[in-house]
């Protein structure tokens, strides 16, 4: 087989591929074996008609078309490898020469990864986030723990304070008329949560249990119900119940109740240790992200829209998988959030473009620095996957090979190695807590 590649536009390559006659003949024979099982040729049992009779029955062009479908996918993949072409989309195939007894010649026009012009990527200054954990950090985390384990007490009397959980009846009016969806009874509202129209919850502060209150608000201009957007409204609200969090005292008894520790000091030490672990991971990530961002900022690349669209679909797929773990699908999510698939695609595009550019720059650096995944690293990654899915590593490897995913795994490993390379070659500046 012969293959040539010519860049005809900035991100478009034209492959010309010639497949030798012998291989075409082999494919024709394969096509015959496939077709003969599918047709009933008069005078012959199904699957037993000779090739010439099958050709007469279905037509030489039909049989040759089947042969072409057998040849092209493999020949195209071989041509990509031979010419080191990296496609980002499906090719447009044009047959130049296609008839029995001759070599098959076809052209494949394909959009490819753009060329990256790297800037300086060594010795760039990167700020490392502070990994300091202060006494104030520990106290804040302790307060959150205290809040999570608070008891809810129903008040017999009193007035609403911030963070109280209330049960309210309300009816909303616009232009003096009650509107659809503006009425509820015994609605649970945490005052100060910001879940209601701006200004609604603030006007409930100080209202006593059992009282009725008239609340005046204006619907936001971007409110989802167009008939209410931007309009002033009045809500008649009755306070049926007030519940308030009762915080436990921060002492040894509290530590025993909420943890495996016997004393408050031991609990604080454990909180500090865990906060430090998080801070150190955050600091490490800040250096890695900073090193990549600095290298990407110095590079120049024009990203094809097809690559951004593909990345958006990957992100949507990941989102769908995460939602499925919570028991809902994308359609339900869009219904709950009053959005659509197109809205989500548009919102995802900026992040998708950033991710694609990062990957392209990392791949370009890997090529220049000859950074690749070793066989040992690939085996380790496959072993991790095997342990996660609880299957034999060799079965996982074969599955990945069949799905064409092994290359992606090696690419991910190489990218991680490039990130470490950038970190090792960066000028790391220690940040402060204020940063």
UniProtKB/Swiss-Prot annotation:
Protein name: Trigger factor
Major localization class: cytoplasm
EC identifiers of the protein: 5.2.1.8
UniProt record similarity statement: Belongs to the FKBP-type PPIase family. Tig subfamily.
HAMAP family listed in its UniProt record: Trigger_factor_Tig
Free-text domain note: Consists of 3 domains; the N-terminus binds the ribosome, the middle domain has PPIase activity, while the C-terminus has intrinsic chaperone activity on its own.
NCBIfam families from the UniProt entry: tig
Biological-process GO terms, alphabetical: 'de novo' cotranslational protein folding; cell division; chaperone-mediated protein folding; protein transport; protein unfolding
Subcellular location: Cytoplasm
Segments forming domain PPIase FKBP-type: 163-248
Listed GO CC annotations: cytoplasm
Record's catalysed reaction(s): [protein]-peptidylproline (omega=180) = [protein]-peptidylproline (omega=0)
Annotated PROSITE patterns: FKBP_PPIASE
Class of the enzyme per the UniProt entry, highest EC level: isomerase
Job of this protein: Involved in protein export. Acts as a chaperone by maintaining the newly synthesized protein in an open conformation. Functions as a peptidyl-prolyl cis-trans isomerase.
Native species: Desulforamulus reducens (strain ATCC BAA-1160 / DSM 100696 / MI-1) (Desulfotomaculum reducens)
């Amino acid at each position: 087989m012969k293959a040539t590649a010519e860049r005809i536009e900035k991100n478009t390559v034209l492959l010309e591929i010639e497949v030798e006659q012998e291989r075409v003949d082999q494919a024709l024979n394969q096509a015959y074996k496939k077709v003969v099982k599918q047709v009933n040729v008069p005078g012959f049992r199904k699957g037993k008609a000779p090739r010439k009779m099958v050709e007469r029955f279905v037509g030489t062009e039909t049989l040759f078309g089947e042969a072409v479908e057998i040849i092209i996918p493999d020949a195209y993949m071989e041509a990509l490898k031979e010419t080191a072409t990296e496609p980002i989309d499906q090719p447009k195939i044009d047959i130049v020469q296609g008839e029995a007894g001759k070599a098959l010649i076809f052209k494949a026009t394909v959009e490819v990864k753009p060329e990256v012009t790297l800037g300086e990527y060594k010795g760039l200054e990167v700020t490392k986030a502070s990994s300091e954990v202060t006494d104030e950090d520990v106290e804040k985390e302790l307060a959150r723990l205290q809040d999570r384990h608070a008891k809810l007490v129903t008040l017999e009397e009193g007035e609403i304070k911030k963070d109280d959980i209330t049960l309210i009846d309300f009816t909303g009016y616009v232009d003096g008329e009650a509107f659809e969806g503006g009425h509820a009874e015994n609605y649970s509202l945490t005052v100060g949560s910001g879940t209601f129209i701006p200004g609604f919850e603030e006007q409930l502060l100080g209202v006593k249990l059992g009282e009725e209150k008239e609340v005046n608000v204006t619907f936001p201009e971007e409110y989802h119900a167009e008939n209410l957007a931007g309009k002033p409204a009045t809500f008649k609200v009755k306070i049926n119940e007030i519940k308030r969090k009762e915080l436990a005292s921060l002492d040894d008894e509290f530590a025993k109740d909420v943890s495996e520790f016997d004393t408050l000091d031991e609990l604080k030490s454990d909180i500090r240790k865990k906060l430090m672990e998080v801070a150190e991971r955050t600091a490490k990530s800040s250096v890695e992200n900073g090193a990549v961002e600095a290298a990407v900022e110095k590079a120049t690349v024009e990203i094809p829209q097809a690559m951004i669209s593909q990345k958006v679909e990957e992100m949507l797929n990941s989102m769908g998988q995460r939602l499925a773990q919570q028991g809902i699908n994308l359609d339900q999510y869009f219904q709950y959030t009053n959005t659509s698939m197109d809205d989500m695609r548009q919102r995802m595009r900026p992040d998708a473009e950033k991710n694609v550019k990062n990957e392209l720059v990392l791949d370009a650096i890997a090529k220049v620095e000859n950074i690749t995944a070793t066989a040992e690293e690939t085996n380790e990654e496959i072993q991790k996957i095997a342990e996660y899915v609880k299957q034999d590593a060799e079965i996982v490897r074969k599955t990945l090979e069949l799905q064409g995913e092994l290359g992606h795994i090696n690419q991910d490993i190489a990218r991680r190695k490039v990130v470490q390379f950038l970190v090792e070659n960066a000028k790391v500046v220690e940040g402060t807590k204020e940063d």
